[in-house]
């Protein structure tokens, strides 16, 4: 598949953000840090109706972390809403890093087409199981109860181990649930993952995603702005 055609497929995922009739649009920004180190801001926009949703996002590392690792990427997805929970149908990602040149991923019902880092030939693989990471962790209005998530290429097993309800004070915005997960990657390694959901004028919203790595500082996505 030619590069221009694959990029065109990616644009098809982004365009629905602007064409949903009567859609509600929201913009969210999360600060991303490792311990006290600010590594950049994760921006994304969501558009939704009663039955459909789409999002597009961008992240680029900044500051001191760039001396050791540099990464930037754009991504988008479209899907359906079932009882208020999003179910991803198509996904697109474009990324570059210090370790690799341009990488492209287009996920559809029939499978995944991707350009490996630094590669010149597009490859095809089976569609991974579950929803993409953003849909599952940042857009689901309750604890994600699916058994799998994916990064557009690889499947990760997801285990919801505990749900803790947080008694809300009088403020209009505050945490209401904390979801605890164990995640198993394709290499058999386990990680812990905590997601805090908060109330807002638009309904439940992800306030924090915390990735807990053995012997390493947590990676934290903390809600900075939402409108």
Annotate the PLM regions.
Residues 22-108, 143-227:
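Acidic, serine/threonine-rich low-complexity disordered tracts
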Residues 12-13:
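Hydrophobic alpha-helical transmembrane segments of integral membrane proteins
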Residues 1-8:
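Bacterial N-terminal signal peptides that target proteins for export
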Residues 16-18:
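N-terminal signal peptide c-region/cleavage motif recognized by signal peptidases
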Residues 96-138:
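Hydrophobic, well-structured mid-protein blocks that either form specific transmembrane helices
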């Amino acid at each position: 598949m030619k590069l221009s055609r694959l990029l065109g497929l990616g644009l098809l995922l982004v365009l629905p953000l602007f064409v949903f009739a009567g859609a509600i649009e929201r913009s969210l920004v999360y600060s991303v840090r490792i311990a006290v180190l600010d590594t950049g801001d994760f921006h994304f926009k969501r558009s939704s109706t009663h039955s459909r949703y789409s999002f597009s996002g961008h992240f680029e590392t900044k500051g001191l972390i760039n001396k050791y690792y540099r990464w930037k990427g754009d991504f988008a997805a479209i899907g359906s809403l079932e009882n208020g929970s999003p179910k991803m149908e198509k996904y697109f990602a474009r990324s570059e890093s210090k370790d690799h040149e341009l990488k492209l991923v287009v996920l559809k019902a029939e499978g995944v087409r991707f350009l490996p880092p630094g590669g010149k030939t597009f490859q095809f693989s089976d569609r991974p199981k579950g929803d993409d990471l953003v849909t599952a962790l940042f857009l689901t209005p309750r604890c994600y109860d699916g058994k799998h998530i994916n990064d557009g290429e690889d499947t990760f097993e997801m285990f919801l181990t505990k749900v803790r309800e947080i008694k809300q004070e009088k403020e209009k915005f505050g945490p209401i649930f904390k979801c605890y997960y164990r995640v198993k990657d394709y290499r058999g390694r386990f990680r812990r993952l905590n997601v805090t959901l908060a109330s807002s004028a638009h309904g439940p919203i992800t306030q924090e995603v915390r990735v807990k790595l053995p012997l390493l500082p947590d990676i934290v996505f903390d809600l900075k702005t939402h409108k």
